[in-house]
Amino acid sequence: MTSDVAVPAPETAAANGHGEAHTTAGFGALTLGSIGVVYGDIGTSPLYAFREAVTAASSGTDGLATPAAVLGVLSLILWALIVVVTLKYVVILLRADNNGEGGTLALMALAQRAVGTGGATIVLLGIISGALFYGDAVITPALSVLSAIEGMKDVTLRFEPYIVPLTVIILVGLFAVQSRGTARVAAFFGPIMCVWFAVIAVAAIHPIIAQPQVLFALNPLYAVSFMLHHGIIGFVTLGAVFLAVTGAEALYADLGHFGKRPIQTAWLFIVLPSLALNYLGQGALVLGDPGAIESPFFQLFPQGWIRGAMVVLATAATVIASQAVITGAYSLTRQAIQLGLLPRFEIRHTSEAHSGQIFIPRINQLLLVAVVLLVLLFRSSSALASAYGISVTGTMVVTAMMGFVVIWKVWRWSPLAAAALIAPFLFLDLTFLAANLLKVFEGGWVPLALGALMIILMYTWRRGSRLLFEKSRKLEFPLADLVAMLEKRPPQRVPGTAVFLTSDPLSAPTALMHSLKHYKVLHEKNVILTIETAQTPRIDPAERVRLEQISPTFSKVTLKFGFMESPNVPKALAIARKLGWQFDIMSTSFFLSRRALKPAAHSGMPRWQDRLFISLSRSANDATDYFQIPSGRVVEVGTQVTI
C-alpha cells in the first residue's frame, strides 16, 4: 500500500508516468528514500522468517534442524525472493502503473477503466485486496516491533518479563506521534535502513566462510527436493517461508512516490543482496550449531554491547517498517473514500509541502487498539507469525488477477499470452495462500476476521450509497424542468451567488428545493456543483473544471479530482474564475443538504445492513471540512430520507 511518509521530491516521482528522476542527485535521493520507506517491512523479515521456517521444517525430526531442512528452507526463501519479488513485482508489475501510481486500488481503477461497463468483479477484487491490507496493517507493527524487542533476551534473560510491556509502550508512542506528521524524522529513514542492510549483510559473511556448504542453497533443486521429500511438512513450511517476502506489495504500492528505476535499483543492488547474505549467514550458523535456531538472527552478532546495539538498531528498523504500513493505511483509506468504498472520515494534512502527508484520527485509533490487543493476546513473535501471511498472500493473489486484466486489456496482449505470463505467479501465490490457510486456527483467523469485517463495511457503504442515490433520483425533480419553470415564473431575486452541492447533476439539489420552498427567493447566480472522482490518481489542473451555462441564472460546474487527491473546492473554483466565471468567495453561499437516514421496510439490503450503513453515514466527516469549504459561507439544509 502507498506509504505517505515524507519522501524526496514526490512531485518529480509522479510527474512523468514512471517517476524517473532527471538528475543523478534526484535519482540518488529517490533511491535512498525508497530504501527507507518501501523496504522496511521485507527488510526486517530476517528477524523471524528463517527461524519460523526452519522450526516448521524440523517438526518431523523432534525439532532438530537437519542440514537437509536448513538448505531446503534457505533455497525456498532465496528463490521466493527471486521469483515473487524480483520477477513478479520488480520486472512485471512495476510497469503496470496508473498514471505513475501503483497499489491495489490504483490497479483496480486501471483495470476497471480498461474493462468499462461490467467491472463489478474488478471492484469486488479491489475491495477484498484493500480489506486484507488492513489486516496486514494491524499485524506488521505488532510482529515487527515484538520480534526486535525479543532480542533483549539474547542480551540477558533478565529482560524477558519486560518484552511485552516495552513493546506496547513503543507502539503506543508510535501511534501517539502520528498526528504531528513524519516529515522531521522521515529524512532519517533511508540512512537508518541503509545502515541496517549493511550491518545484516556484513554480519553474515563470517558464518558463510566458516560453513561454505550453505551456498548449495542457491541451487533451486534443493528447494524442489525438500518439497518432494517432506510431504505435508514441506507444505506447512511454505507458509513460514512466505514470511520472507511479506512487504513485496510495497514495491508496487509506493511506485508513485519514488518511480520505477529507484525502486528497482534499490532492490537489485542493495536490498536483495543484503537479504540473501543474511539468510545464508543464518543458515550457515545453524548448520554449525543446530541449537542456534532459537534465535539465529541475533546470534550472528557477538554477545555483549554489540548485540545490545543491534537490538536498538532492529527496533529502529521495525518502527520504520511499522510507520510505512501505518501511513499506507491512511493512504489506502483516502483512496477508498475517493472511490466510494468508505464514508468521508476526517483527514488532516500534516505537511504544507507534501500533499500526501495525511493523518486520519479514526483509522489511527482503531489501528492502535487492534495492534495493542494483538500483542497482549499472542505475546510472542513466534505466535504472531502464525497470524501473518494470509492477508498478504490474499492481496498478492488479487494483484495477480487484476494484473492479468491490465496486461490483456491495457497492454493489449492476447488473453493466452497474458495468461501464460501471469499463471505461474498466480499458481505460486495460490500455493502460498493454501499453505498459510493451514494456520487459520493458530492465529490466521485474525487477518481473515479483520478482512471480512472491512469487506462487509466497504460493500455495505458502496451498495447503500448506490441505493440511496437511486432512491433520491426518483424523488427529486429534474433540474432542466425546474430551470425552465423558474425562467418562466422567476421568484424574487437576492444578490450574490448560491452554490448547491449535489452528487446528481441531472436532478435539482435538495438544498435548492428547500430554499425555494421555505425562503421563496432565488439568488442572482446559481451554480449546481458536482464533484467527481476520476479513475486516475491525479488530475491535471487544466482538466479540473468543467463549466456549462444552462440558463442566464443557472450554470453547472463539475470539479474532477484524482483518487489520490484531497478535494479543495475553493482552490478548484479559483481555476473556474480564470475560465471566465465571475466568482467571489465573499459574496458566495454554499448550500449543502444533510440527510438524516431511517431504515425502510424494503430497501434492497437486509435490515442489519441498513443499520450498518446508517451508522457509517453518521460517522462520516462533515462535507464542509472534507471539501475544505469556508464554514462561514455554508448553509446546511436538513432532510430525512428512508432507505
Swiss-Prot record:
One of its GO terms (biological process) is potassium ion transport. It is found in: Cell inner membrane. GO terms for cellular component: membrane; plasma membrane. Keywords: Cell inner membrane, Cell membrane, Ion transport, Membrane, Potassium, Potassium transport, Symport, Transmembrane, Transmembrane helix, Transport. One of its GO terms (molecular function) is symporter activity. It comes from the Bacteria. The chain crosses the membrane at residues 23-43, 67-87, 119-139, 159-179, 185-205, 226-246, 267-287, 309-329, 358-378, 388-408, 415-435, 440-460. The keyword Transport applies. It is a multi-pass membrane protein. It catalyses: K(+)(in) + H(+)(in) = K(+)(out) + H(+)(out). It holds the Pfam family K_trans. Belongs to the HAK/KUP transporter (TC 2.A.72) family. Transport of potassium into the cell. Likely operates as a K(+):H(+) symporter. This is Probable potassium transport system protein Kup 2. It comes from Bradyrhizobium diazoefficiens (strain JCM 10833 / BCRC 13528 / IAM 13628 / NBRC 14792 / USDA 110).
